[in-house]
């Protein structure tokens, strides 16, 4: 169904988008560290909540994109465009339902999640969350629009918008934080502005009728329960999976915070590098959902199997290249980061162990899941990922830390166990062909 050129045009921009966004995010984080310890703590606390909420919007966008892809694959373009409208309606409604309580009840919400924190930190967090919450509808709409363009095989546009948005965010930080001295409010305003502009651009471009998916009129959108239900059947399990994954990371983070500054600094560096090393492969996974979704919609099940295998292999190669490169230059990376000698030594040791294992087991533990979700096998993916995450990563990590008094290596032993078990489960599910038996549209 796809030529090599079509796959290149789809996948390369997706890979660049993920890598560039990760790089820009790191730069953004470094800039925010200049506004004081109370402000840094506030941003860190609120961002952990922000990531959880943004994952909900990303899951909704995934659900809508899979429905649209399957309709396009079955040559039902009108229904695909109708599904896009319902996706926009759904994310707008859900984002407003989330935004309003986050603004009105932000103090009790932050107290409930993070307990008692210093007054200065809480005041900064309240200001930051108020402005950040205003951006939720815009990031939700952008995610929906970006997913639809990728489904239409136009992944260059979301890449360009994401890159421009990140540049705008950094320039906004310079202006609001350093020129106007607005502190955390400046950081939040910069994020809000960049998200508003990104959403407006993508909504305007979605009105072009030349593309596979477009919206003729936003004012004419009315809810259709049947289509919204189809989107939610994929979006809700995916959202639970993403949410549990993020929540598990927070539990692990709180465990690491008891290990001392040397271990915390080393763990933070390795975690950042580990996340960066797989961004390009995640881009391939996002492309896989479009490709496999269309194949399943066209009832080309052998093609769906073929592309799941071939794109997983490609992602494996890309992951190995990124991991090997980071392992090769890890000493220089820790030096550029200005890490203290003990933290750098621990980070280098951990990186070599973790990345050697990651090159083998990370890809089969994640990439087949994109193909399964595209076929509608979202409940299996949710259950497998959630159980594996909590049993291996969380329980094993806490057990090793509290029983054997292990340092950050405990986190990566748990993660390695998660990758290994999930790899075998996903591969067994893929071989069984049960993932192709779901009816999505």
Regions flagged by a language model, labelled:
Residues 61, 131-150, 158-166, 187-202, ...:
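Short runs within selected transmembrane alpha-helices of multi-pass transporters and secretion channels
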Residues 40-100, 139-158, 264-330, 361-385:
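Small-residue-rich hydrophobic transmembrane alpha-helices
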Residues 2-30, 34-35, 51-63, 67, ...:
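N-terminal transmembrane alpha-helices
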Residues 37-48, 125, 129, 188, ...:
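Small-residue hotspots at the loop-to-helix junctions and early N-terminal turns
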Residues 14, 18, 29-30, 66, ...:
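Transmembrane alpha-helix boundary and packing residues in multipass membrane permease domains
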Residues 23-41, 110-119, 175-184, 243-276, ...:
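Helix-terminus/linker motif at the lipid-water interface of multi-pass membrane proteins
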Residues 9-28, 131, 165, 194-198, ...:
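Transmembrane helical elements of multi-pass membrane transporters/channels
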Residues 1-14, 68-135, 179-236, 292-358, ...:
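Short alpha-helical transmembrane segments in multi-pass integral membrane proteins
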């Amino acid at each position: 169904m796809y030529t090599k050129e079509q796959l290149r045009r789809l996948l390369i921009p997706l890979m660049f988008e993920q890598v560039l966004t990760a790089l820009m995010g790191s730069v953004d984080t470094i800039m925010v560290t200049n506004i004081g310890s109370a402000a840094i703590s506030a941003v860190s606390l609120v961002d952990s909540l922000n990531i959880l909420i943004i994952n909900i919007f990303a899951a909704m966008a995934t659900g809508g994109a899979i429905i649209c892809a399957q309709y396009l694959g079955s040559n039902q373009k009108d229904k695909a465009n109708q599904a896009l409208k319902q996706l926009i309606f759904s994310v707008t409604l859900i984002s407003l339902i989330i935004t309003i309580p986050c603004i009105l009840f932000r103090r009790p919400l932050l107290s409930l999640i993070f307990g008692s924190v210093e007054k200065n930190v809480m005041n900064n967090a309240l200001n930051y969350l108020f402005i950040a919450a205003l951006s939720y509808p815009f990031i939700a709409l952008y995610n929906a629009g970006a997913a639809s363009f990728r489904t239409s095989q136009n992944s260059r546009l979301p890449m360009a918008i994401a890159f421009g948005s990140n540049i705008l965010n950094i320039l906004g930080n310079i202006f609001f934080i350093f020129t106007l001295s607005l502190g955390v409010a400046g950081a939040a305003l910069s994020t809000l502005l960049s998200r508003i502009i990104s959403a407006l651009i993508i909504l305007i471009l979605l009105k072009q009728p030349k593309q596979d998916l477009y919206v003729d009129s936003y004012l004419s959108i009315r809810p259709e329960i049947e289509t919204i239900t189809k989107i939610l059947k994929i979006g809700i399990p995916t959202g639970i999976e993403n949410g549990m994954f993020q929540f598990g990371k927070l539990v692990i983070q709180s465990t690491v915070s008891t290990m001392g500054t040397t271990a915390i600094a080393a763990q933070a560096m390795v975690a950042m590098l580990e996340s960066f090393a797989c961004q390009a492969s995640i881009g391939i996974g996002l492309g896989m959902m479009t490709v496999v979704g269309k194949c399943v919609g066209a009832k080309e099940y052998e093609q769906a199997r073929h592309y799941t295998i071939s794109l997983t292999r490609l992602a494996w190669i890309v992951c190995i290249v990124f991991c090997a490169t980071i392992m090769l230059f890890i000493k220089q990376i820790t030096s550029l980061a200005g890490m203290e000698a003990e933290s750098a030594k621990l980070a280098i040791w951990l990186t070599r162990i973790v990345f050697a294992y990651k090159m083998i087991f990370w890809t089969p533990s994640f990439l087949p899941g994109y193909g399964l979700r595209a076929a509608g096998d979202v409940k299996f993916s949710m259950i497998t990922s959630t159980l594996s995450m909590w049993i291996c990563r969380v329980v094993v990590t806490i057990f090793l830390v509290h029983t054997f008094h292990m340092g950050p290596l405990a986190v990566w032993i748990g993660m390695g166990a998660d990758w290994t078990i999930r790899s075998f489960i996903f591969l067994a599910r893929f071989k069984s062909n049960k993932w192709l038996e779901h009816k999505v549209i």
